[in-house]
Amino acid sequence: MAMVSEFLKQAWFMDNQEQECIKSSKGGSSVQSRPNFDPSADVSALDKAITVKGVDEATIIDILTKRTNAQRQQIKAAYQQAKGKSLEEDLKKVLKSHLEDVVVALLKTPAQFDAEELRASMKGLGTDRR
């Protein structure tokens, strides 16, 4: 997604007179690294949220949306090591619909997400010659 977003920004800037104004504005990620980040504590909280009766979606959302992508990757690895199974697969089993899609997307690296979105967007493109 980041690559596509950057491409669209560059394409838009070609004919835009406000380019300098926009370039000077502060940007970047709104999610900051947590100084006291502990992946094993997050793994425990996520495991509890997944296994509790009724699934604690609020805890899952709270943890995954308040961590940087690098921290989410550490959580994934720590979960795999501690539980011997994939965090993504466990979340897919208990979550449904759009929430499942968003949570699974949050667990991907930016490159994985971009590649899968580009592949999905091009699926079915081409001609059907007869």
Curated annotation (Swiss-Prot):
Gene Ontology molecular function terms on file: calcium ion binding; calcium-dependent phospholipid binding; phospholipase A2 inhibitor activity
UniProt membrane topology term: Peripheral membrane protein
Modified residues (Phosphoserine): 24
Sequence positions that bind Ca(2+) 2: 92, 95, 100
Residues given in the record as Ca(2+) 4 binding sites: 127
Matching PROSITE patterns: ANNEXIN_1, ANNEXIN_2
Keywords of this entry: Adaptive immunity, Annexin, Calcium, Calcium/phospholipid-binding, Cell membrane, Cell projection, Cilium, Cytoplasm, Cytoplasmic vesicle, Endosome, Immunity, Inflammatory response, Innate immunity, Isopeptide bond, Membrane, Metal-binding, Nucleus, Phospholipase A2 inhibitor, Phosphoprotein, Repeat, Secreted
Compartments where found: Nucleus; Cytoplasm; Cell projection, Cilium; Basolateral cell membrane
GO CC terms, sorted: apical plasma membrane; basolateral plasma membrane; cytoplasm; early endosome membrane; extracellular exosome; extracellular space; lateral plasma membrane; motile cilium
Residues the record lists as binding Ca(2+) 3: 122, 124, 126
Covalent cross-link site, Isoglutamyl lysine isopeptide (Gln-Lys) (interchain with K-?): 19
UniProt cross-references to SMART domains, sorted A to Z: ANX
Free-text domain note: The full-length protein can bind eight Ca(2+) ions via the annexin repeats. Calcium binding causes a major conformation change that modifies dimer contacts and leads to surface exposure of the N-terminal phosphorylation sites; in the absence of Ca(2+), these sites are buried in the interior of the protein core. The N-terminal region becomes disordered in response to calcium-binding. The N-terminal 26 amino acids are sufficient for its extracellular functions in the regulation of inflammation and wound healing. Acylated peptides that contain the first 26 amino acids of the mature protein can activate signaling via the formyl peptide receptors.
Note from the entry: Was originally identified as calcium and phospholipid binding protein that displays Ca(2+)-dependent binding to phospholipid membranes and can promote membrane aggregation in vitro. Was initially identified as inhibitor of phospholipase A2 activity (in vitro). Inhibition of phospholipase activity is mediated via its phospholipid binding activity that limits the access of phospholipase to its substrates.
PANTHER family according to UniProt: ANNEXIN (PTHR10502), ANNEXIN A1 (PTHR10502:SF17)
Protein name, as recorded: Annexin A1
Gene assigned in the entry: ANXA1
